[in-house]
Amino acid sequence: MPSFIDTTKASIARVYDTALGGKDNYPADREVVERLRQVAPEIEQFTVDHRAFLVRVTRFLAGQAGIDQFLDCGSGLPTAENTHQAAQRLRPEARVVYIDNDPSVVAHGRALLEENDRTFFVPADLLEPRQVLDDPLVTRTLDFTRPLALLQLGTLHHYDESGGRSCADIMREYIDALPSGSYVALSHFLDPQDQDSALARRMEDVFLHSPLGSGTFRTREQILAMMPGLELVEPGLELCVNWWPDGPRLAPLLPAQRCLVGVVGRKP
């Protein structure tokens, strides 16, 4: 289990925490957010939209889809509304296993488990599906003979594919292991290939050349390739802020909000 926290390097989880207004972060993390703010002043809203997408997706899965077991890859630091809280509010018996190997997250992982005895944390590398799927706590907690939900929210855009495997390959390995009737939710930075592409590339440049060093904006086709063999839930791949919003839109979208998409699919 990772134990050393290098505070001189930015962490994905802590940068996210910074943008959400949290306190579990360090100067290197705050530097990334400040640099992003210079090219996209609305970066905090970008992050809030992503968290809201996670909550709406989880409510859909626990409510209408009837899912009561969740594998959440890249859990991040505990915040106001975590997956287990959103799921168990609708389905108290729901079991949630969080996966993350960020040392900061591992150090705080216990906080995610204090709520109840149906929430678990596994320090594993989400880019290694077999490491995750074969973990004893995962196999003991989740019943792979019944439908479950796999969440890959805000994770794969931090993988640059230089390791030889594509994001699509990684997701295919996860999806192959899921039973029929399972759901997959994914969110990702988008290069919209329109007037907002320049902003996407400026944000990508900041991510890649900041203390964080990762954050790739991919096209719709590249992102959809990460959902092989799944039946997409309406409205398909959509801006996170527009995926079944809580109400009518009263203000125009900010440019950065048009560079973050999410999708949910069901395995036949």
Language-model-detected regions and their locations in the chain:
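Conserved Class I S-adenosyl-L-methionine
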Residues: 198-221
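Conserved beta-strand signature within the Rossmann-like core of class I S-adenosyl-L-methionine
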Residues: 148-152, 170-189
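A short, conserved alpha-helix within the catalytic core of class I
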Residues: 129-134, 158-173
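Rossmann-like AdoMet
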Residues: 1-124, 128-130, 137-142, 259
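Core SAM-dependent methyltransferase catalytic element
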Residues: 243-268
